[in-house]
A protein has these predicted regions:
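Short glycine-rich, Thr/Ser-proximal phosphate-binding strand/loop in the N-terminal lobe
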Residues: 12-39
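Phosphate/pyrophosphate-binding loops at sites that engage ATP/ADP/AMP, CoA/4′-phosphopantetheine
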Residues: 47-56
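Short glycine-rich phosphate-binding loop at a beta-alpha junction
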Residues: 56-69
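Short, surface-exposed basic-aromatic patches at helix termini and helix-loop junctions that form
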Residues: 75-85
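Short alpha-helix plus adjacent loop in nuclease-associated cores
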Residues: 91-131
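Extended, highly charged alpha-helical segments
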Residues: 122-166
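Glycine-rich, often acidic, oxyanion-interacting loops/wings at catalytic, nucleic-acid
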Residues: 150-189
Length: 189
């Protein structure tokens, strides 16, 4: 962990705040970049500048899981060829877990970049050991399967309701018959 670069990413619609620090909490930069491929390239160029001055073997990136805003930066950073030579691990953490961890920093002032700093510190103290690294293609496949299953279940419920409504409308007269006259009253008949 000593030769590791920790990156915290505070993801937003228009821009991502990146805080890059080492194990000794030396902050190399805490800057905002656009939330697009060009912005991610700018971050990678800044990391290249750091690599020219300092030695590190591994990169750990932590970002809050914010759905569609965090998915593309996570995919980009986890699949970048330059970053992969450092055995880069990208983690997306639950917003509730992050808020609980953030409450322990009660003495920090509210300013731009503080969330990115706390996310980088989350990785620095080893909180990512209980998490699984982000794998974009696996995530997309699982997401699509889950959504397809949900869609099929909803369609099945709708079709069952449709059939039951038609049965009731077609055979509503059977409801007024006595128990002895019901055509489907015998379980074994």
């Amino acid at each position: 962990m000593q030769n590791c670069l920790f990156i915290g990413v505070d993801v937003a619609l228009k821009g991502n705040q990146f805080c890059v620090m080492n194990f000794d909490q030396h902050i190399y930069f805490n800057l905002k970049f656009p939330n697009n491929p060009e912005g991610n390239d700018m971050v990678i160029n800044k990391i290249k500048d750091i690599e020219n001055k300092f030695f590190f073997e591994k990169i750990i990136v932590v970002m809050e899981s914010t759905g569609m805003y965090s998915f593309h930066p996570a995919c980009y950073l986890s699949s970048n060829e330059y970053l992969n030579k450092f055995h880069t691990e990208v983690y997306q953490i639950n917003a509730c877990d992050f808020d609980k961890y953030k409450k322990s920093f009660h003495d920090l002032e509210k300013e731009d970049g503080i969330d990115a700093y706390i996310l980088a510190d989350y990785a620095r103290v080893g909180r990512t050991k209980a998490l699984y690294p982000f794998r974009g293609s696996q995530y997309i496949a699982l997401q699509r399967l889950t959504r397809q299953r949900y869609h099929i279940c909803k369609e099945l419920i709708r079709e069952k309701a449709y059939v039951l409504t038609n049965l009731y409308l077609s055979f509503s007269g059977l409801m007024s018959l006595d128990k002895n006259e019901l055509p489907f009253s015998d379980l074994f008949g």
